[in-house]
């Protein structure tokens, strides 16, 4: 296993544990992402939440290079939260906060 994969795995294991302890599911969850300010990248993030009750807000950076995407959505479980993070992680240039 590559070092990055191991660190990613450990991060999601800690997140799952924290979400299980701190939250009664289903529950609202706030995702925050930074993506390059390209319409197709923003659309990819938004598309990952199609068919949900997601409230999506975007804001461009001061120079217009990046866009902040905040998404508030009801999730069923910690595993569902993590699955969305993994789903959007394939979008080129995305940063999950």
Protein language model annotation of sequence segments:
Residues 1-68, 74-97:
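Long, contiguous binding/interaction regions
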């Amino acid at each position: 296993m590559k070092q990055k994969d191991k660190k990613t795995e450990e991060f999601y294991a800690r997140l799952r544990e924290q979400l299980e302890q701190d939250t009664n599911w289903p529950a609202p969850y706030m995702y925050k992402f930074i993506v390059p300010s390209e319409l197709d990248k923003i659309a990819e993030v938004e598309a990952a939440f199609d068919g949900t009750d997601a409230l999506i807000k975007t804001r461009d950076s001061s120079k217009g290079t990046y866009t902040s995407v905040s998404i508030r959505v009801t999730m069923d479980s910690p595993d569902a939260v993590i699955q969305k993070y993994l789903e959007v992680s394939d979008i080129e240039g995305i940063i999950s906060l």
